[in-house]
Curated annotation (Swiss-Prot):
Name recorded for this polypeptide: WD repeat-containing protein 19
Keywords assigned: Cell projection, Ciliopathy, Cilium, Cilium biogenesis/degradation, Cytoplasm, Cytoskeleton, Disease variant, Ectodermal dysplasia, Flagellum, Leber congenital amaurosis, Nephronophthisis, Repeat, Senior-Loken syndrome, TPR repeat, WD repeat
GO CC terms of this entry: ciliary tip; cilium; cytoplasm; cytoskeleton; intraciliary transport particle A; motile cilium; non-motile cilium; photoreceptor connecting cilium
Organism of origin: Homo sapiens
Protein's job: As component of the IFT complex A (IFT-A), a complex required for retrograde ciliary transport and entry into cilia of G protein-coupled receptors (GPCRs), it is involved in cilia function and/or assembly. Essential for functional IFT-A assembly and ciliary entry of GPCRs. Associates with the BBSome complex to mediate ciliary transport.
GO BP term, example: nervous system process
Self-association and partners: Component of the IFT complex A (IFT-A) complex. IFT-A complex is divided into a core subcomplex composed of IFT122:IFT140:WDR19 which is associated with TULP3 and a peripheral subcomplex composed of IFT43:WDR35:TTC21B. Interacts (via C-terminal region) with IFT122 (via C-terminal region). Interacts with BBS1. Interacts with TTC25.
Length: 1342
């Protein structure tokens, strides 16, 4: 909303003012204040007239058409009438001496009702000038009233009476009310069925508190509504919509109630629109909006949804409060009076007038203001003030035109300013105008006038200055027109579209349509045109080839069309109506020819008129005088694609393909990375004949075959031939054939049909295009017919296919003749043909046909002739010709035939021949049976059973051995034949259960079989075997019980089996039983701790296993078995590490000390005494962990330290050896030397080298493993025992323990295994690690 003017007359200040809009047109506004003058302004705030009054204005009103303004004033008995058409004022004497108090024009007639302070009434007919005075209508002042559509007049007065009179002044009804009435209105009452009745209901405010309803049809049954006291007084109310009342209260409340029967007074909406006060309500049915004012602001809401606040206008300068609101009937202007005596007029709805030329737009931004802008090129908008409210606007490259009726004003558009050029009158009322760079074309009354805009500047020839279309002799009316850079184009009521070429000043093209052309819309270049005919059908017309293309799904409500101005989308245009925009694309070059497609539709906001389309962005003009940009739904891909998912991208890809934006589609396919999307893009390229782009796409997805095909055709210039190839690639073969036949190479149609094996079509084409190809096509067609079972036609085509000069082809045809002859029943001809034919395959195929026809003799003859011995023998068997079968048997490979032959020989009692035939037939059961029953050769039968694993054969052999009393062999073969129950019973009866158990343990056996064996051994008190089979059948509790019962001779095996049982069972009760047994709780004899360790490992209880491992290692260490202790700790360390369980510090420390001890031997052996000495010092400092070898270790430490030059360390450990408990145990070989070291001490010492901590780079001794700087335990090198260095890191590829890369390489020169895990290792397997971060995790991180 925009304030267009304010009226601030000095004489009005300090008092409220009255005002009234001219009805219908709203061109005038009558305003009066305390100055005894009614001033009449136009809609732009210019004063047009005034009426001088003898006193203050009492009331004023416009008649229904807005032609006459009636005014009454104090101190006067005259009614003042101002005529809007003549701008003259007349006076009418009321004929009564009373002071007038009320005035109102009728809604439908020219009746004026005037009431007086004494209750008298005057009805004046302005049309006939008849006056009807009615005395005593009321006893006191008439204060309010209203007319209805039937010219009934309702009046209210200070006498608390409501009267209803007709236009003659006769009283029809009168009703007494309890308070003084005000604001009286007639309205339509809604009945139960919601149908409208006549205006028979009167609503009136009583005492400013109550809303009273009087039904003229039921005057004795009035209704009233009272409201909450805190709402204040009723200020005003308005009827709207379907029987609803909108009521404003002085305290700012705003209420909507229903008046439907049964709903009277039901509240629909309530809001406190204004905090302190509300002074007025105004409803615009045209805009469907309501305005309220108060608290120095105006609020406008939508009647459809009152919660929707359309706009809020603040008037901070009006500090004395606001007055009354009023709309013009068209809803275009809203006037507001104020308590201080000012009046403001706001523009609420503008006529949507606008035009576009290329990317420049011009649109109405106020009643007398046009804005010219170029949003695409970023030019600053230029505002042009115009002299009149325009009915039309046009913009060109350099000019702007506005106008109304038959007159137009032209302006020159400069860079930053606009200059008025001239105005021009036309011969009729202008419907529309179009601008060219030099010319303007105006359409009026069925004609178009083309004229120069600046004729004096161009120095043009006189005949080229102006021209009127159509010519005098042309009896048509022009209905629409357009100007492009080169042409004037217009459409007529006779259906002609004319192109007038401005440069040559002559017509160059015309198109005749069957019905009249209502609207035309050329594209920016004028090479294409959309027109709409009187049937509301849309077409695209191309003047270049004079072709039209119907626009599909074209809505009959379409108001206009805009072409895309973005140069890359030349064929895109939109058609719009009030609700939607439809995006169309004109595809000029497709394999199906030129066509128009509907790409999609976009919902347009209310009252938006499209002005410009650029790259999918639609610039629309709104009622508020602004422009709003919306993106078409068909161009959703122009938004950011980064966060778009595949489900949203696929519809966008389809949009791109419809719009022929292949580069954008390529990017989407790249993001989707989906072969289906790439194929869709490729097919679209083929459809649009974009061969190069299609090659690029198919190359991207690796479709080599089609890339090669497209490369071969891309240079073809014949449009139809190229389109035919592409149609074929897209599987549209009928289209491809039509295109090929229309091209310069029609034979391509025949080649395509042959490739597709469409032989019927190929034969039809060959008759005209290549008669010499008919035999070859006939043969192929015959093959297809044969396959379909049409043997008659197949035979005919085979016969047609014989050429006589093409041997290979003729042989194929003769083979077909032979087969079809047999199928048709001409067996002799077919067989003779097949026997003469050189093909073996033909003989086989004909033999098969004959065999199906039960012609066995001929079939076998052909099979044998064709060397198909299996088939021949089979047919001979069917005909019981065993002699022939026997002759063919050496050549037969089919087991089935051998079996049939074997059965025949067995029946004849020829067992040796039968057994050979059975073997050839792989019928081992029969072979075994014959060896056992007839040939008495059990050895051969047993060998065959073992080789073939025949179940039935094994049963037969088992029965055979059972008869011989060989129970072990019988059990073996019973198990082999899956007869486990029989084998078990036999083993039980003959005490052969061990054999049965051994055999069944290696078989795929059921739990029931294992349980049977376990129960047998349990009965025999063979606990180990019983436990083993209980374990196999999953009965863990019973298995454990038996293992624990085993005698001590089987103790080791039994405990191992018990551990396996508990590991599988994962049962806490069983686990505790076994632990108690291992700890000696049952028999007082604890078992070796290694079993407890294995138990915990089996249960995957790695922490408990670790504790046990530490105990075992400690025992091994105490016993002097240091390598065993090291290996136990290492294996546990590796297991815990693989399970990602934290390593106990005691385990890690013990492993490090033991490993240091092991390293001593390696370094001393290699002659590196310093490294050996340093490790011995570490071991000697933990000497309590080596109780079995304290003296030897200390002795070695003293010797190695002395050798390495660590004299002070040697002295310290020598002094320790001199203690009484150790002195006597020193080896005599070293005793004197050590005593000498103690007596003559040398405390010189080579200082230990320092190296940086890998965590914090603090320098510390190289054998120190705890950093004083960061307090971290540093990993140690498994080759030297020193702490690790960040830049010299490697790990053993087997155990993953770290080592100094340089030192481990040196060690591997003499050693072949890892010092930690003892796995084989060489220097080539080592890799230096540049980033050792993963090995430097602190304990907190772990």
């Amino acid at each position: 909303m925009k304030r267009i003017f304010s009226l601030l007359e000095k004489t009005w200040l300090g008092a409220p003012i009255q005002f009234a809009w001219q009805k219908t047109s709203g061109n005038y506004l009558a305003v009066t204040g305390a100055d005894y003058i009614v001033k009449i302004f136009d809609r732009h705030g210019q004063k047009r007239s005034e009426i001088n009054l003898p006193g203050n204005c009492v009331a004023m009103d416009w008649d229904k058409d807005g032609d006459v303004l009636a005014v009454i004033a104090e101190k006067s008995s005259c009614i003042y009438l101002w005529d809007a058409n003549t701008n003259k004022t007349s006076q009418l004497d009321n004929g009564m001496r009373d002071q007038m108090s009320f005035l109102l024009w009728s809604k439908v007639g020219s009746f004026l009702a005037v009431g007086t302070v004494k209750g008298n009434l005057l009805i004046y007919n302005h049309q006939t000038s008849r006056k009807i005075p009615v005395l005593g209508k009321h006893t006191k002042r008439i204060t309010c009233g209203c007319w209805n559509a039937e010219n009934l007049l309702a009046l209210g007065g200070e006498d608390k009476m409501i009267t209803v009179s007709n236009q003659e002044g006769d009283t029809i009804r009168q009703t007494q009310v309890r308070s003084e009435p005000s604001n009286m209105q007639f309205f339509l009452m809604k009945m139960d069925d919601r149908t409208s009745a006549a205006e028979s209901m009167i609503s009136v405010v009583l005492g400013k508190k109550t809303l009273f309803f009087l039904n003229l049809n039921e005057p004795d049954n009035p209704a009233d509504l009272e409201f909450q006291q805190d709402f204040g007084n009723i200020v005003c109310y308005n009827w709207y919509g379907d029987g609803r009342i909108m009521i404003g209260f002085s305290c700012g409340h705003f209420v909507v109630i229903s008046t439907h029967t049964g709903e009277l007074g039901q509240e629909i909406f309530q809001a406190r629109n204004h905090k302190d006060n509300l002074t007025s309500i105004a409803v615009s049915q045209t805009l469907n909006k309501v305005a309220t004012c108060g608290d120095n602001c105006i609020k406008i809401q939508d009647l459809v949804d009152l919660k929707d606040m359309y706009v809020i206008l603040n008037l901070d300068e009006e500090n004395k409060g606001l007055g009354t609101l009023s709309w013009t009937d068209d809803g275009q202007l809203l006037a507001l009076s104020t308590q201080r005596g000012s009046l403001h007029v706001f523009l609420t709805k503008l006529p949507i007038l606008g035009d576009a030329c290329s990317t420049r737009i011009a649109y109405l931004t106020s009643l007398l203001e046009v804005t010219v802008a170029n949003p695409v090129e970023g030019e600053l908008p230029i505002t042009v003030s115009v002299d009149v409210e325009p009915n039309f606007v046009a913009v060109g490259l350099y000019h702007l035109a506005v106008g109304m009726n038959n007159r137009a004003w032209f302006y020159v558009l400069g860079e930053n300013a606009v200059k008025k050029l001239k105005d021009m009158e036309y011969l009729g009322t202008v419907a529309s105008i179009c601008l060219h760079s030099d010319y303007a074309a105006a359409l009026f009354e069925g004609k178009v006038q083309l004229h120069l805009i600046e004729s004096e500047i161009l120095d043009a020839q006189e005949e080229r200055e102006t021209r009127l279309f159509p010519a005098v002799d042309d009896k048509c009316r022009i209905l629409c027109h357009a100007l492009t850079s080169d042409f004037l184009i217009y459409g007529t009521d006779t259906g002609v579209v004319q192109y007038f070429y401005i440069e040559d000043w002559q017509f160059v093209n015309d198109y005749r349509h069957p019905v009249s052309v209502k609207k035309i819309f050329p594209d920016p270049n004028g090479t294409r045109l959309v027109f709409i005919d009187e049937k509301s059908d849309g077409f695209v017309y191309c003047p270049v080839n004079d072709a039209t293309y119907e626009i599909p799904d074209f809505s009959p409500t379409i108001k206009g069309v805009l072409w895309e101005n973005w140069p890359m989308d030349k064929g895109v245009f939109i058609a719009y109506d009030d609700d939607k925009v439809y995006t169309y694309v004109f595809h000029k070059d497709t394999i199906q020819g030129a066509k128009v497609i509907l790409a999609g539709s976009t919902k347009v906001p209310f009252a938006h008129k499209p002005l410009l389309l650029y790259n999918g962005e639609l610039t629309c003009q709104t009622q508020s005088g602004k422009v709003n940009n919306i993106y078409l739904s068909t161009h959703g891909f122009l938004s950011n694609l980064k966060d778009t998912g595949p489900d949203e991208l696929r519809p966008m890809l389809a949009q791109n393909l419809m719009l022929k934006r292949f580069s954008d589609a390529w990017e989407m396919c790249r993001i989707l990375n989906d072969e289906a999307a790439w194929n869709e893009l490729a097919r679209a390229c083929l459809h649009h004949m974009e061969v190069e782009f299609a090659i690029r796409v198919y190359r991207r997805i690796g479709n080599v075959g089609i890339v090669m095909s497209l490369e071969q055709i891309k240079g073809i210039e014949d449009y139809n031939l190229l389109a035919g190839h592409l149609a074929m690639f897209t599987n549209d073969y009928n289209l491809a054939q039509d295109l090929y036949l229309a091209s310069s190479c029609p034979i391509a149609a025949l080649e395509m049909r042959r490739d597709l094996q469409h032989w019927d079509s190929a034969l039809q084409l060959a008759k005209h295009l290549a008669p010499d190809q008919i035999p070859f096509i006939s043969k192929e067609y015959a093959i297809q017919l044969e396959f379909a079972g049409d043997y008659v036609n197949a035979l005919a085509h085979y016969e047609k296919g014989i050429t006589g000069d093409n041997k290979e082809h003729d042989e194929a045809c003769l083979a077909g003749v032979a087969q079809m002859s047999i199928r048709m029943g001409d067996i002799r001809r077919g067989v003779n043909q097949a026997l003469k034919h050189p093909s073996r395959v033909l003989k086989r195929d004909c033999g098969a046909i004959l065999e199906n026809m039960k012609q066995f003799s001929e079939a076998a003859q052909l099979y044998e002739k064709g060397l198909y011995y299996d088939k021949a023998a089979s047919v001979y068997i069917r005909s019981k010709n065993w002699a022939k079968v026997g002759d063919l048997l050496p050549h037969v490979s089919s087991p089935k035939i051998h079996l049939q032959y074997a059965k025949a020989k067995e029946a004849d009692g020829r067992y040796k021949e039968a057994v050979v035939a059975y073997e050839n037939a792989k019928q081992w059961q029969s072979v075994i049976r014959i060896y056992l029953d007839h040939l008495n050769n059990p050895e051969k039968a047993v060998n065959i059973v073992r080789e073939t694993q025949s179940l039935d054969g094994a049963k037969m052999v088992a029965r055979f051995f059972l008869q011989l009393g060989d129970y072990g062999s019988a059990i073996q073969f019973l198990v082999m034949s899956k007869c486990n129950n029989e084998a078990f019973t036999l083993a039980q009866q003959h005490n052969k259960m061990e054999i049965y158990a051994d055999i069944i343990g290696s078989e795929d056996t059921t739990n029931e079989d294992y349980q049977s064996i376990a129960l047998y051994f349990e009965g025999e008190k063979r606990y180990l075997q019983a436990g083993k089979f209980f374990l196999l059948c999953g009965q863990y509790s019973r298995a454990l019980k038996h293992f624990l019962k085993c005698p001590s001779s089987e103790d080791n095996v039994a405990i191992e089996m018990a551990i396996e049982t508990v590991g599988q069972a994962k049962d806490e009760l069983l686990t505790n039983q076994l632990i108690d047994h291992l700890l000696g709780e049952n028999d007082g004899m604890p078992k070796d701790a290694k079993y407890l360790f294995r138990l915990y490992m089996a249960l995957k209880q790695y922490r408990e296993a670790a504790q046990t491992a530490i105990i075992i290692a400690r025992e091994e260490q105490s016993a002097g078995n240091y390598r065993n202790a090291h290996d136990v700790l290492f294996s546990m360390y590796a297991e815990l590490k693989s399970q990602k369980i934290k390593i106990p510090s005691e385990m890690a420390t013990n492993l490090m000390i033991l490993h240091s001890y092991i390293l001593v031997k390696i370094h001393v052996k290699n002659g590196d005494h310093m490294k050996g000495a340093r490790m011995l010092i570490r071991v000697a400092n933990n000497i309590s962990k080596f109780p079995s070898h304290i003296v030897p270790i200390l002795t070695s430490t003293v010797i190695e330290c002395h050798r390495a030059g660590l004299k002070n360390s040697a002295f310290s450990f020598a002094a320790m050896l001199m203690r009484p408990e150790y002195r006597s145990k020193i080896d005599a070989k070293y005793k004197k030397k050590i005593e000498g070291m103690v007596r003559r001490p040398d405390i010189s010492e080579i200082e230990e080298a320092t190296t940086p901590c890998p965590f914090c780079k603090f320098l510390l001794p190289e054998c120190e493993l705890l950093c004083p700087g960061c307090k971290n335990s540093i990993p140690y090198c498994i080759a030297t025992g020193r702490h690790m260095l960040k830049d010299d890191w490697t790990v053993c590829p087997h155990c993953d323990f770290p080592a100094l890369y340089s030192e481990l390489k040196i060690m591997l020169n003499t050693e072949s295994t890892c010092p930690m895990c003892s796995e084989r290792l060489n220097a080539a397997q080592l890799k230096k690690i540049s980033d050792c971060t993963q090995y430097l995790r602190t304990e907190e991180e772990l």
